[in-house]
């Protein structure tokens, strides 16, 4: 996410969207703000045409960059037990984090919650990449905490769960 737009462009986009700069990387929130501002800035609705053009350019560039980051990578392979285990339905709460705080502190190869699966995927992808994984390129809980500078607490987990819940399964790269 940090390579999608340069610093000046990202600040300008967040200002145009009317969002706090700390929300950079929260794609669902940015999308809602973009759609709202499109109505406000649209020239046919009496809005500012220049702001509309600039916002469209920056948002499109950000969106294209995120799509590029979401291209499938063909890193490590999954064995049959992992594929079968991930298809089980453990329930809504256990789906995100089966055991707090154990899953948040240490990866468990036997756990099938999203927190552990995304951390395992992070570790596998890290082996095949030169540059570090960052939020939106990787949706694991650790990348989320590092990107937004958040502590390891249940409140942070709830924020992460909310964003993961609004993210398509394909984008999670599981």
UniProtKB/Swiss-Prot annotation:
Keywords: Acetylation, Activator, Early protein, Eukaryotic host gene expression shutoff by virus, Eukaryotic host translation shutoff by virus, Host cytoplasm, Host gene expression shutoff by virus, Host nucleus, Host-virus interaction, Metal-binding, Oncogene, Phosphoprotein, Transcription, Transcription regulation, Zinc, Zinc-finger. Its main location: host cell. The modification N-acetylmethionine is found at residue 1. The keyword Metal-binding applies. GO terms for biological process: symbiont-mediated suppression of host gene expression. Residues 12-75 form the J domain. The common region of SV40 ST, 17kT and LT proteins comprises the J domain. This domain is essential for multiple viral activities, including virion assembly, viral DNA replication, transformation and transcriptional activation. This domain is also required for cyclin A-transactivating activity of ST. Promotes efficient viral genome replication by accelerating both G1 and S phase progression of the cell cycle. Inhibits host PP2A by binding to the A subunit, thereby displacing lower affinity regulatory B subunit. Inactivation of PP2A in turn results in the transactivation of cyclin A and cyclin D1 promoters. Late during the infection cycle, ST may induce dephosphorylation of host eIF4E-binding protein EIF4EBP1 leading to the inhibition of cap-dependent translation. May establish and maintain high levels of viral genomes during persistent infection in cell culture. This is Small t antigen.
């Amino acid at each position: 996410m940090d390579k999608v737009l340069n610093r000046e462009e990202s600040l300008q986009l967040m200002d145009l969207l009317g969002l706090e700069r700390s929300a950079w990387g929260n794609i669902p929130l940015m999308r809602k703000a973009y759609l709202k501002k499109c109505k406000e800035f649209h020239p046919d609705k009496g809005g500012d045409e220049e702001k509309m053009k600039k916002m469209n350019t920056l948002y499109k560039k950000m969106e294209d960059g995120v799509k590029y980051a979401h291209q499938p990578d063909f890193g490590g392979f999954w064995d049959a037990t992992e594929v079968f285990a991930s298809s089980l339905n453990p329930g809504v709460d256990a789906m995100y984090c089966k055991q707090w705080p154990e899953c948040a502190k240490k990866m468990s190869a036997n756990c099938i919650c999203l927190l552990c699966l995304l951390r395992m995927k992070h570790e596998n992808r890290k082996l095949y990449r030169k540059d570090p994984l960052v939020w939106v390129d990787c949706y694991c809980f650790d990348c989320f905490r590092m990107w937004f500078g958040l502590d390891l607490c249940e409140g942070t987990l709830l924020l992460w769960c909310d964003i993961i819940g609004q993210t398509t399964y394909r984008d999670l790269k599981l």
